[in-house]
């Protein structure tokens, strides 16, 4: 059978499965409210798996039915959808629609935005075709489910502006850094695309502390927590946190928000949050209100450098977004520092949580099979989102996003053994390791 036939059949089959699992909870697109199951919670695993297959096959179907030159033109000018989203965020269009009673004419919207009606109309119609906002009559707009999230109170506009401003500009430095013989292999953010485009020798983090960068700090303060919140539900739901043992150690925990969320969901767990000394006041602020548990030792906040041997004995060690910041040898060294503690508790697990860069391998022998059948399970979900997210983080922050096999090799180099992969219902995933038997038998070299 042809690729067209197979895609259409599989989309129909997976659609039937999806409807069967969801029942009456079929969601909505044009109402200005979240679809609770998909936007605030997680769909049942069966519905989620069917959704992933449908999206993958629909993307392939669109590519199949799009003329080649149209496909390439669309991709090369897709940056203009970023421009449009930046306009909606900067002018607070979602807020203005709400303030106008939920519906607004283009003329009035341009007036309250103090901008040109024709230019704003071009932006709004582009976004409507991408199902962000809805044009309900000629030149009349409402929020829909997706644009409703762009209310100022959510922090989403902050994230949009990070990408449409710093991210957009930093992207111009990506090709030069890939060609530069000095920087093409370097993952140091001070030598990356952001530094190249902005003419500085530091990454975006230190730059935000400079006089120029501090002017743009407000959107980062709002946007980054919003972005982090996307993965919260999957992080606490898609791992069997209570199956490892009573103590979780978050290594390089940042503000400690992940550990706090796990604690809320599994109150019987003991939590250890570790980061460098300057982060300790921030972590303590995160756990404000938990003073009794801290006093009882059920929550511990420790200053720890993950380049030094781990001395805290726990049942599971969680490293989120740590490995990506370093070259392979350095990442392996960080994991190797856990071995002294793992030898004291050989049943303990190490969880490496990252964007797991997806692949779509299509052998000629199965080229007509639905695209969803070519998606490995040991990679991040939402592959299109994961790919642009991984490139975005490397452009802005340097580092090295990796595939599943890359991370397994790093763990094995550190003296760990791969145990299993946890595919989150999100664009991150977690690789679970344990102490390799041969490592446990050897003396520590740390």
Give residue ranges: language-model regions.
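Alpha-helical subdomain
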Residues: 1-121, 135-137, 241-446
